Design a protein with these regions (language model features):
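Channel- or pocket-lining gating/hinge segments that regulate access to a cavity or pore
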Residues: 170-286
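Short, functionally important structural connectors and interaction interfaces within domains
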Residues: 2, 30-33, 93-98, 195, ...
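Juxtamembrane boundary at the C-terminal end of a transmembrane helix
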Residues: 293-300
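Soluble non-transmembrane domains of integral membrane proteins
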Residues: 12-170, 174
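A residue-level signal for conserved active-site and pocket-lining positions in enzyme catalytic cores
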Residues: 8-10, 255
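Bacterial N-terminal signal peptides
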Residues: 1-8
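Terminal, compositionally biased non-globular sequences in eukaryotic proteins
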Residues: 12, 285-286, 293
Length: 300
């Protein structure tokens, strides 16, 4: 009789334990990142350095030893606050990113900081963005770049084991090149060369061939110097398309110079006048139109 009473009690206890196990919720980790500075952004290598405060709060114990920094490494960690429910660390890190150079040199990039739990998957621990403790210092300056936005969100990432994913807190900061410095540094020298070359069409002497040949070589050298600042990519950048139009313009002017020289040797003044007239009618409008169409693509 005693055994009959004990069995229902044991069964009820086992069922209750199983129910508790099935309803176990993952550990909630509130994470906030406040960036105090960025530096050494190298587009060619896709690397940058950063200093930021990492603030963690959770009902269960969590420390910096439980956190993995993705796509980078921590170079120094200083503990600011260390209480059971709240951790605050000042971290210096070297990070990497994948630059998008389609619009180079009017390119913009995202500087990401991503963290995840080293050992617990998303069924055991999940991140929640602590918006009150997330931000960017207003005095942060990255020479040659302008900050124009930031975001923070949580996502899950699956690694080699497709049945297991990890919660990841992602903080992104968007930068773009300063427009005025880009125009002065990249395009002003090229535009001066193009203007001089187009103005040479007004010259009716054969001496313009030497001028345009020099302008063509100067454009090649400037292009080589500018393009050397970025890695090799498998697509045409804005600068590449700009230089294609530039080479086409300079090439047409050089060809007209060669034709003019050949006609001058043949003493065919009528044909020289015709070549000069049609060169002025076709080359400048075509060149300006192509440049305008190219710059309009930046608005898309």
């Amino acid at each position: 009789m005693t055994m009959l009473v004990t069995l229902p009690v044991l069964a009820e206890t086992a069922y209750g334990s199983l129910q508790v196990q099935n309803t176990t919720q993952p550990e909630i980790i509130h994470a906030g990142i406040f960036v105090s500075g960025f530096g050494n952004f190298n587009v060619e290598q896709g690397s940058f350095s950063t200093n930021f405060f990492l603030i963690l709060s959770s009902d269960t114990p969590v420390t910096i030893d439980d956190i993995q920094l993705m796509y980078g490494r921590m170079t120094s960690v200083e503990t600011i606050v260390d209480t059971p429910g709240l951790k605050n660390y000042l971290i210096s890190a070297e990070m990497t990113t994948t630059p998008d150079l389609h619009r180079y040199p009017f390119d913009s990039h995202t500087l990401p900081i991503q963290i995840k739990h080293k050992h617990k998957n998303d069924k055991q621990a999940v991140f929640v963005i602590d918006t009150a403790r997330t931000g960017l210092d207003k005095e942060t300056v990255l020479p040659g770049w302008e900050f124009y936005g930031s975001s923070a969100y949580v996502t899950n990432k699956t690694f080699l084991n497709a049945s297991e994913s990890y919660s990841r807190a992602v903080f992104t900061y968007n930068v773009q090149r300063d427009t005025l410095s880009t125009l002065l540094k990249f395009f002003l020298p090229i535009l001066i060369i193009v203007i001089i070359s187009l103005c040479s069409l007004l010259m009716k002497t054969s001496s313009r061939l030497g001028v345009n040949a020099s302008m063509f070589l100067a454009a090649v050298m400037i292009h080589w110097r500018i393009a050397d600042a970025i890695p090799l990519v498998g697509y045409a950048t804005f600068l590449d398309e700009f230089m294609i139009i530039t080479y086409a313009t300079l090439g047409m002017v050089v060809v007209t110079g060669i034709v003019t020289l050949m006609l001058a040797e043949a003493k065919d003044t009528a044909q020289i006048e015709r070549v000069n007239r049609w060169s002025l009618r076709i080359i400048p409008p075509l060149s300006i139109g192509l440049y305008c169409l190219l710059f309009l693509t930046l608005l898309v």
